[in-house]
């Protein structure tokens, strides 16, 4: 009798596929709200297993310590601020309505005071491209799409640190192994046609093709539901 395929194992949610959130340092949020001004000093730059971008440990004027997303050029000893009335400089967080057109921003809030949702990956940035009469601010996202935000949403001035991370090749399989192991990702990924017949519906047969139609119905039982699920059409488009 065949055992469960990888897709079924993944759906169970065991420790092999579960994100190691117990190793994450903190949920990164803006230190202040958009109706006040909070400032502090950067006391350390650290690595967080939850992300590829480095994070900064800041001590606020109140004595509280908080982790925030680091931007390029931010260093230990720098003074940063969050909230309305701050200076437009690298690392400071202000409402979008106070940031001039043409500035690079990151860690943008989707709604006012939600802590930051967009543009948080290493090396990415968005661009302030315009402001509307109703208070909205136009942002060009890293994808190239233009998106409008509430002018009260806060964003950090600058580019997320850690750019160019993907340019260095792994070279050796061992380095790739430890890289994916840190995020509980299954690696390497083996094609179904390369597996034994017990491991996948496309496996076995001593050949490198599935040997059956790849289209399966929406209501197909688990373990057989692989390939083109409920496909309207298959194959290449004719020019």
Curated annotation (Swiss-Prot):
Protein's GO biological process = cytoplasmic translation
Region Disordered: start-end pairs: 205-224
For this protein, the record's InterPro entries field holds:
NA-bd_OB-fold, Rib_uL2_dom2, Ribosomal_uL2, Ribosomal_uL2_arc_euk, Ribosomal_uL2_C, Ribosomal_uL2_dom3, Ribosomal_uL2_RNA-bd_dom, Translation_prot_SH3-like_sf
What domain of life does the UniProt record list for this protein's source?
Answer: Archaea
Quaternary context: Part of the 50S ribosomal subunit. Forms a bridge to the 30S subunit in the 70S ribosome.
Q: What does this protein do?
A: One of the primary rRNA binding proteins. Required for association of the 30S and 50S subunits to form the 70S ribosome, for tRNA binding and peptide bond formation. It has been suggested to have peptidyltransferase activity; this is somewhat controversial. Makes several contacts with the 16S rRNA in the 70S ribosome.
What protein does this entry describe? Large ribosomal subunit protein uL2
Q: Which organism is it from?
A: Methanoculleus marisnigri (strain ATCC 35101 / DSM 1498 / JR1)
